[in-house]
């Protein structure tokens, strides 16, 4: 019985993880600016006129601290500024920059995906360096603790 329960739990967790992972199409559109630690703008020449030829991509599966007026406390603002600086630096230093698009964001004005810098995921870089937490739409944990 324990084996059956263990196998069932493993299967459920595998399915849940797979739902978080979205297939991504990779493009080499130029990055135009860094908005914050987990959001970057890039040239989008595929958009028809009169639409602006730029889109934002939010790094899927992470949450970085907010900065400026969106921060809930001075500590979050400082962390948000640091995450933004990290992302800018990583993009500037990279020789090869790719946009990996998974889907449209729930708000419709930007896409979800990842930024691939010299073959490395910005998502993983942000998490490994302490500038982001994994996030898949659940209630966010405060950065003010």
Label for each model-derived stretch:
Residues 4-12:
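Sec-dependent N-terminal signal peptides
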């Amino acid at each position: 019985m324990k084996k059956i329960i263990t196998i069932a739990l493993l299967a459920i967790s595998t399915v849940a993880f797979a739902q978080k992972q979205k297939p991504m199409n990779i493009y080499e559109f130029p990055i135009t600016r860094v908005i914050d630690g987990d959001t970057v703008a890039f040239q989008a020449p595929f958009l028809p006129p009169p639409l602006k030829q730029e889109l934002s991509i939010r790094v899927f599966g992470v949450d970085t601290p907010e900065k400026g007026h969106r921060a809930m406390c001075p500590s979050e603002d400082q962390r948000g500024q640091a995450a933004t600086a990290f992302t800018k630096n990583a993009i500037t230093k990279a020789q090869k920059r790719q946009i990996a698009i998974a889907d449209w964001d729930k708000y419709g004005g930007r896409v979800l995906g990842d930024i691939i810098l010299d073959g490395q995921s910005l998502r993983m870089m942000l998490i490994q360096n302490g500038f982001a937490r994994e996030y898949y739409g659940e209630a966010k944990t405060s950065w003010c603790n």
